[in-house]
C-alpha cells in the first residue's frame, strides 16, 4: 500500500486508537473496518478511500478522518469495496462492551478478497475463481484454480504467460495470487482484464505437504498426484486459512487433462460466442434452461471443456437421449429440481462454520426432493444408474426437521429458530423471556390490589430497568418495602426486591436463550459436517441430472437431433446456427460434408450473404456434439475433434498494442503450430489486413500448408476468389458459395450454401441496403465500371493458369521451414 497521508505521531493516542493502530499495522494492505458499537469505522487513509468509493460522509474523531458503515448494512458496502479491487479486514468486538473491563477486546475475524468470498450475499450464482500461479524450474507455470464458495479445485499446467492470458479471458477469475518474483509478469495482463492480484511471500509456496493433509483431513495425499502443483496448492490453502481465519475446506483436486478435454482458446470462445461477453447473444444463454445454480455453473464448464473421449461423449448422449425420449419424466424431474438450492455453497458454509439457519432449511428443502427424483429416474431403464448414484441422506432431513422451525423470524440467538421440545432448558428460558409481559401484568394487578392504588403501573426504561410508578397524590399509600429510585413532577418511581429479582431472571433468560440456541444450532451443524462427502456427491449428481435433463429439454424445444459419432466423416443435413436461429424469423438451413479425402472448402460470397454464420454454425455443431448435447440439424454425423480453431473478423489487440494484421497473423501462427489432422479449422477473411497481393499470397500459402501438412478439416471463407483456383490442383479442396438472387428491385441474399464460386462481391448493393446516400451509390457504380474496363485482374494478381498449376502441385511435398516464419 502507498505511504499514509497522515502522521499519527503527533496525534493524541487514546487506548482505543492505539488498539486500532496496532491492528492496522498487521493489515497494512487492507482496508480495516473497525467495529465500534453499531458501526464499522474506517480511519485515516482508509476513511478517505471508503468515503470516496461508498459515497458516505467523512467525519473526524480526535482529528483523525473517520467514515462509518452501519453494522447491519455491511454486506452491501463490502461488495462495493471488493468490486473496486480492495482487500477488506473485518475487525469485530470479541466481548460485550457493557461487560468489558477497560478497552473492548477486538480481533480481525475475516479478510475479504475478490477470490475468497463465501458469503452468499456477495456472490452471483456463477463460479468465483482464484488462481494461484507458480513458475517451475523448467519455465512452465503450475496453476491451481479454486472456488472458495464451492470448494472446487482444478489443476492445470500452463506453457506460457500467453496461455495464462488466454485462460483468464474464458474463465471467471476474480483474483490471482503469485510469488513476488512472478508479479511483474502477470500484473499488466490482470489489470487489463480487471483481475485483482496479490503477491505473496515465498513461505506461502513452501512445499508443506502437512498443510495439504490438514486441509483434506487425510494421512496420505499420494493419490492426488500433484507434482509441482503442490506448491501453488499450498499457497492457496494458506491464503484461504489467512483470509477466512479458519482451516481451508476443499474438494479433491481435478486435473484439467488435455488428453480428456478439448482446449478452447479465447479467440475461438469469442468467435463462436460460447459464453456471455461483450457481443451479447451466445450459446450458453440459448442452452441454459437449467433449474439449479449448480447446474448452471456446470453447464458453462461443460461448454468451455468439450470432451475428446468418444466413450465419454456417447455416455452423455445416452443420458440426454433417455430424457429426450421421455418428455413427461423430463418435465417431472425439472419440476423437482426447481426445489433444489445451491447445495455446493451450503456445504461449504457448513464446513467454514458460517452457515445460517436459512441454509439448513434450504438443505432440508433440497433433500425433500431427492427421493422423488430417485423414484422418477428409476422408472426409466436408461436412468436407473443415475438414481442409484444419489446417496440416501434422509436422516439429515429428519434431523433438521426435528430441530429447526420451518418458518422463523429474527436472528439466531433470539430464541425463535429452535423447535419447542428440543431443549427443556431452552423452552423454560424462552417461556420466561417471551411471556414476561404476562408475568408483569400479574405482578401489577397484585400490587394494585394490595395497595389499593388503581393508577399504579409497572414500566421499564434503560436507566432504571423495571420500576413501579405511583401518581403524586397517592404516594402516601406506597408500602414500606417500596424503595424510591426517582422523583418526577407528577409521580414517584419505586422498585422492590421481587421486581429486581424478576428483572435479573429476564436478563439472564435473554443471555441463556442466546447461548442455548446458538449451541444447539452449532451442534446440528457439526453433526452435518460428518456427511460432507455424501452431500458433495449429491450436489454433483444433482448438477449432472440438471444438465442432462436441460439438454434434453432444450433439444426437444428447439428441434435438435442426436448426433452420431464417426471416425472421420463429418456430415450434417439441414444444419442451423443454434444462436442466430433464435433471433430471426426464418433461418435457412445448410449442409456440410467432409472426410479425410474431402477436407477443405473455399467459401466465397458477398458480405451479408451468411458466410460467417455458416462457418460458425459448423463449429458450433461440432462443439455441441462433444459436450454431449443434441445438435440443430435434421441429421448429423460428427467426428471427435481434438481442437476447434477459428480466425475471424478484423480487430486490434488494444491490450498489447498489436495492429489488426499482426493480431490476425498471431492467431494464424497459433493455428498452424497447434492444429493436427484431427482438428477443425475455421477461417474467415485471412489476409484482408494487408495489401491485396500480400493477402492473397499469404492466404494461398497458408491453405496449401494446412491441406498438405496438417491435413485437417478446414473451411476458409474469403473474398479472394483467386483462392478458388486451389480446387483445380487438389482433389480434396472444393468451392462453396452462398446463393444470391438478382431482381429488378435489387439483390436478394438466399443464405443457401451451394457448390460454386461467387462471381460478384455485391459490395455496392450491400452499401445501398445499409442506407448510404443514393448519390454515393450511383457514383460508386460509375467508378466500378471504369475500373472494370481498365483492369486486367488476371495479369495484376497473377491468377495461375493451367500450365502454372503443375508448378504449384510440386509444393505438396512440404513447406520450407522459412515459410512458416511468415506467420
Curated annotation (Swiss-Prot):
It holds the Pfam family MutS_I. Keywords: ATP-binding, DNA damage, DNA repair, DNA-binding, Nucleotide-binding. GO terms for cellular component: cytosol. Gene3D superfamilies: 1.10.1420.10, DNA repair protein MutS, domain I, MutS, connector domain, P-loop containing nucleotide triphosphate hydrolases. InterPro entries: DNA_mismatch_repair_MutS (IPR005748), DNA_mismatch_repair_MutS-lik_N (IPR007695), DNA_mismatch_repair_MutS/MSH (IPR017261), DNA_mismatch_repair_MutS_C (IPR000432), DNA_mismatch_repair_MutS_clamp (IPR007861), DNA_mismatch_repair_MutS_core (IPR007696), DNA_mismatch_repair_MutS_N (IPR016151), DNA_mismatch_repair_MutS_sf (IPR036187). One of its GO terms (biological process) is mismatch repair. PROSITE patterns: DNA_MISMATCH_REPAIR_2. One of its GO terms (molecular function) is ATP-dependent DNA damage sensor activity. ATP binds at residues 605-612. It comes from the Bacteria. NCBIfam families: mutS1 (TIGR01070), PRK05399.1 (NF003810). Belongs to the DNA mismatch repair MutS family. This protein is involved in the repair of mismatches in DNA. It is possible that it carries out the mismatch recognition step. This protein has a weak ATPase activity. HAMAP family: MutS. This is DNA mismatch repair protein MutS. It comes from Fervidobacterium nodosum (strain ATCC 35602 / DSM 5306 / Rt17-B1).
Amino acid at each position: 500500500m502507498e505511504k499514509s497521508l497522515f502522521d499519527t505521531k503527533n496525534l493524541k493516542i487514546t487506548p482505543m486508537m492505539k488498539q486500532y493502530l496496532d491492528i492496522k499495522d498487521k493489515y497494512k494492505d487492507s482496508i480495516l473496518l473497525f467495529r465500534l458499537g453499531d458501526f464499522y469505522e474506517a480511519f485515516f487513509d482508509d476513511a478517505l478511500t471508503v468515503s470516496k468509493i461508498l459515497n458516505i460522509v467523512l467525519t473526524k474523531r480526535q482529528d483523525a478522518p473517520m467514515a462509518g458503515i452501519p453494522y447491519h448494512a455491511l454486506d452491501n458496502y463490502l461488495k462495493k469495496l471488493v468490486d473496486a479491487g480492495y482487500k477488506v479486514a473485518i475487525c469485530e468486538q470479541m466481548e460485550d462492551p457493557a461487560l468489558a473491563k477497560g478497552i473492548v477486546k477486538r480481533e480481525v475475524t475475516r479478510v475479504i478478497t475478490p477470490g475468497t468470498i463465501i458469503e452468499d450475499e456477495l456472490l452471483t450464482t456463477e463460479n468465483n475463481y482464484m488462481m494461484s500461479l507458480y513458475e517451475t524450474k523448467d519455465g512452465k507455470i503450475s496453476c491451481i484454480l479454486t472456488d472458495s464458495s464451492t470448494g472446487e479445485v482444478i489443476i492445470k499446467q500452463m506453457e506460457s504467460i500467453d496461455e495464462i492470458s488466454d485462460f483468464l479471458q474464458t474463465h471467471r477469475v476474480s483474483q490471482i495470487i503469485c510469488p513476488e518474483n512472478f508479479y511483474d509478469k502477470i500484473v499488466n495482463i490482470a489489470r487489463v482484464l480487471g483481475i485483482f492480484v496479490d503477491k505473496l511471500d515465498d513461505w506461502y509456496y513452501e512445499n508443506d505437504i502437512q498443510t495439504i493433509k490438514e486441509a483434506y483431513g487425510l494421512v496420505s495425499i499420494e493419490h492426488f498426484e500433484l507434482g509441482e502443483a503442490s506448491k501453488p496448492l499450498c499457497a492457496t490453502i494458506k491464503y484461504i486459512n489467512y483470509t477466512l481465519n479458519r482451516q481451508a475446506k476443499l474438494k479433491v483436486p481435478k486435473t484439467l487433462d488435455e488428453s480428456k478435454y478439448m482446449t478452447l482458446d479465447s479467440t475461438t470462445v469469442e468467435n463462436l460466442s460460447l459464453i456471455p461477453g461483450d457481443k451479447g447473444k451466445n450459446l450458453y444463454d440459448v442452452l441454459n434452461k437449467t433449474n439449479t445454480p449448480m447446474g448452471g455453473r456446470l453447464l458453462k464448464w461443460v461448454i468451455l471443456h468439450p470432451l475428446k473421449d468418444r466413450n465419454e461423449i456417447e455416455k452423455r448422449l445416452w443420458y440426454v437421449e433417455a430424457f429426450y425420449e421421455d418428455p413427461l419424466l423430463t418435465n417431472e424431474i425439472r419440476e423437482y429440481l426447481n426445489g433444489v438450492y445451491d447445495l455446493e455453497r451450503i456445504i461449504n458454509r457448513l464446513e467454514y462454520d458460517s452457515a445460517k439457519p436459512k441454509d439448513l432449511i434450504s438443505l432440508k428443502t433440497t433433500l425433500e426432493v431427492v427421493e422423488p427424483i430417485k423414484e422418477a429416474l428409476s422408472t426409466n431403464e436408461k436412468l436407473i444408474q443415475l438414481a442409484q448414484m444419489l446417496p440416501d441422506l434422509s436422516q439429515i432431513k429428519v434431523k433438521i426437521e426435528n430441530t429447526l422451525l420451518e418458518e422463523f423470524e429474527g436472528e439466531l440467538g433470539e430464541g425463535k429458530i429452535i423447535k419447542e421440545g428440543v431443549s427443556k432448558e431452552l423452552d423454560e428460558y424462552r417461556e420466561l423471556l417471551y411471556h414476561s409481559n404476562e408475568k408483569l401484568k400479574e405482578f401489577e394487578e397484585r400490587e394494585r390490589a394490595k395497595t389499593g392504588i388503581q393508577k399504579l403501573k409497572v414500566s421499564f426504561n434503560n436507566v432504571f430497568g423495571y420500576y413501579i410508578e405511583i401518581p403524586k397524590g397517592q404516594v402516601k399509600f406506597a408500602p414500606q418495602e417500596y424503595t424510591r429510585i426517582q422523583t418526577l413532577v407528577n409521580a414517584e418511581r419505586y422498585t422492590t426486591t421481587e421486581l429486581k429479582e424478576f428483572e435479573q431472571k429476564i436478563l439472564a433468560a435473554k443471555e441463556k436463550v442466546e447461548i442455548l440456541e446458538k449451541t444447539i444450532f452449532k451442534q446440528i451443524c457439526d453433526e452435518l459436517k460428518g456427511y460432507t462427502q455424501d452431500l458433495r456427491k449429491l450436489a454433483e449428481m444433482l448438477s449432472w441430472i440438471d444438465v442432462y435433463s436441460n439438454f434434453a429439454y432444450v433439444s426437444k424445444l428447439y428441434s435438435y437431433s442426436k448426433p452420431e459419432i464417426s471416425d472421420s466423416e463429418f456430415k450434417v443435413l439441414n444444419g442451423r446456427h443454434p444462436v442466430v436461429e433464435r433471433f430471426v424469423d426464418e433461418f435457412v438451413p445448410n449442409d456440410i460434408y467432409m472426410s479425410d479425402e474431402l477436407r477443405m472448402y473455399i467459401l466465397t460470397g458477398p458480405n451479408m450473404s451468411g458466410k460467417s454464420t455458416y462457418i460458425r454454425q459448423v463449429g458450433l455443431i461440432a462443439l455441441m456434439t462433444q459436450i454431449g448435447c443434441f445438435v440443430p440439424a435434421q441429421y448429423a454425423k460428427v467426428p471427435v475433434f481434438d481442437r476447434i480453431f477459428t480466425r475471424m473478423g478484423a480487430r486490434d489487440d488494444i491490450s498489447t498494442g498489436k495492429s489488426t494484421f499482426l493480431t490476425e497473423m498471431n492467431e494464424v501462427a497459433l493455428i498452424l503450430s497447434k492444429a493436427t489432422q484431427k482438428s477443425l479449422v475455421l477461417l474467415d477473411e485471412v489476409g484482408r489486413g494487408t495489401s491485396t497481393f500480400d493477402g492473397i499470397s499469404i492466404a494461398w500459402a497458408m491453405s496449401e500448408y494446412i491441406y498438405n501438412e496438417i491435413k485437417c478439416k478446414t473451411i476458409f471463407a474469403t473474398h479472394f476468389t483467386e483462392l478458388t483456383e486451389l480446387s483445380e490442383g487438389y482433389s480434396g479442396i472444393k468451392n462453396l458459395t452462398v446463393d444470391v438472387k438478382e431482381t429488378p428491385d435489387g439483390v436478394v441474399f438466399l443464405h443457401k450454401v451451394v457448390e460454386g464460386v461467387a462471381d460478384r462481391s455485391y459490395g455496392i448493393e450491400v452499401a445501398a441496403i445499409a442506407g448510404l446516400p443514393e448519390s454515393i451509390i450511383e457514383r460508386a457504380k460509375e467508378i466500378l465500371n471504369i475500373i472494370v474496363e481498365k483492369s486486367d485482374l488476371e495479369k495484376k494478381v497473377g491468377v495461375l493458369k493451367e500450365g502454372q498449376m503443375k508448378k504449384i502441385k510440386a509444393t505438396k511435398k512440404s513447406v520450407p521451414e522459412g515459410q512458416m516464419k511468415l506467420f
